[in-house]
Swiss-Prot record:
Gene: glyA
Protein name as annotated: Serine hydroxymethyltransferase
GO cellular component, one term: cytosol
Site (Plays an important role in substrate specificity): 228
Domain of life from the UniProt record: Bacteria
Taxonomic lineage: Bacteria, Bacillati, Actinomycetota, Actinomycetes, Kitasatosporales
């Protein structure tokens, strides 16, 4: 049989077995990592299409390769759809990831050595917002801002630091922060010091698309996002900007940072943007929010707090909950491992003023997007919250909790058509 036409199982049973095992893991467990979601079958079909074969350096109508007439159509559809979804003047759908979207935006707006401001990593920021070991911390002078004692971004500190440091760019966005940001206040501060405002909405873009979270696009010069997480599409990135900055942004992506775009992924992005414009998507995002609030409310009850578990900022406005374990018998790694043994996948996460090392941490980040995509409603999220609350206590019935996790997974079959 020709290798060109062999199936994965026929050609490479070792890789096929690992893929099959991962499918089973996703089907049989509860995915609660806040940055993860389940891509629709149509999205995966587009990503696995023949578009993976096509090189297309450049942009629609201006390519450096022949034979791009069909990928031009696909990419323009993606551009038009995401501009409409968020009300943006311009969009670049080529970044391979959110990190590359952030890098390209910074390359377009900054010079090495310029000053930037971003949320401190331990306070909820992202690597690309100025961490020293990241390109953003190596190329630019970074002035981090922080959350206050209540766990909310300290806008007075942001304003003070901006006036003192006169940054060229202020980054508003986060990777582990449970509250909404005041984009209008960030823009006012940016304007006062002559800085660009870049919003990284990778985590909450789906909520914005559904009208359940303030839209940063009217306030920011540039907005970056991933296309997975709450958007629920393929893994990739996007940059939205004003028309005035579009040429700089496009040049920073190609040829500045990337060569050929991944047109099969761009096709998958286009499909996911169509889904995100629909009513079913909006209803799912509401269940995502409701689920996170149900979880947060359960974890602040006395039977949980008395064993040293607390919720940062006291609750959530978004799709995730940050759990503080500093006063618990468990550290972040132990809590993650315990939930994993029960069939619930979360991730340990640093919290503000965390006394433990990064690979251990004193916190958990727990998200609801994947379960909402799977179909979970309020009753189901209440059951999940009860399971997690029980598991974080010193004494718990592992067998009972495992059985309850299995029952929830079986109630909402995932990808039943995939074998």
């Amino acid at each position: 049989m020709s290798l060109l036409n062999s199936s994965l199982h026929e050609l490479d049973p070792d890789v096929a077995a690992a893929v099959d095992a991962e499918l089973h893991r996703q089907q049989s467990t509860l995915e609660m990592i806040a940055s993860e979601n389940f891509a629709p079958v149509a999205v995966m079909e587009a990503q696995g299409s023949v578009l993976t074969n096509k090189y297309a350096e450049g942009y629609p109508g201006r390519r450096y390769y022949g034979g791009c007439e069909h990928v031009d159509v696909v990419e323009q559809i993606a551009i038009d759809r995401i501009k409409a979804l968020f009300g943006a003047e311009a969009a670049n759908v080529q970044p391979h990831s959110g990190a590359q979207a952030n890098a390209a935006a910074m390359f377009a707006l900054l010079k090495p050595g310029d000053t930037i401001m971003g949320l401190n990593l331990a306070h909820g920021g992202h690597l690309t917002h100025g961490m020293k070991i990241n390109f953003s911390g190596k190329l630019y002078n970074v002035v981090p801002y922080h959350v206050d004692e209540s766990g909310v971004v300290d806008m007075e500190e942001v304003e003070r630091l901006a006036k003192e440091s006169q940054p060229k760019l202020i980054v508003a966005g986060w990777s582990a922060y449970p509250r909404q940001l005041d984009f209008a206040a960030f823009r006012r501060i940016a304007d006062e010091v002559g800085a660009y405002l870049m919003v990284d909405m990778a985590h909450f873009a789906g909520l914005v698309a559904a009208g359940l979270h303030p839209n940063p696009v009217p306030h920011a010069h540039v907005v970056t996002t991933t296309t997975h997480k709450t958007l629920g599409g393929p893994r990739g990135g996007v940059i939205l900007s004003t028309q005035e900055l579009a040429k700089k942004i496009n040049s920073a992506v190609f040829p500045g940072q990337q060569g050929g775009p991944l047109e099969h992924v761009i096709a998958a992005k286009a499909v996911s943007f169509k889904i995100a414009a629909g009513e079913e998507f909006k209803e799912r995002q509401q269940r995502t929010l409701d689920g996170a609030r149900i979880l947060a409310e359960r974890l602040v009850q006395p039977d949980v707090t008395e064993v040293g578990v607390s919720v940062l900022s006291g609750g959530t406005d978004v799709h995730l909950v940050l759990v503080d374990l500093r006063n618990s018998e468990l550290d972040g790694q132990q809590a993650e491992d315990r939930l994993h043994e029960l069939g619930i996948t979360v991730n340990r996460n640093a919290i503000p003023n965390d006394p433990r090392p990064p690979m251990v941490t004193s916190g958990l980040r727990i998200g609801t997007p994947a379960l909402a995509t799977r179909g979970f409603g309020a009753e189901d999220f209440t059951e999940v919250a009860e399971i997690i609350a029980a598991a974080l206590k010193p004494s718990y019935d592992a067998d009972d909790l495992k059985a309850r996790v299995v029952a929830l997974a079986e109630k909402f079959p995932l990808y039943p058509g995939l074998k």
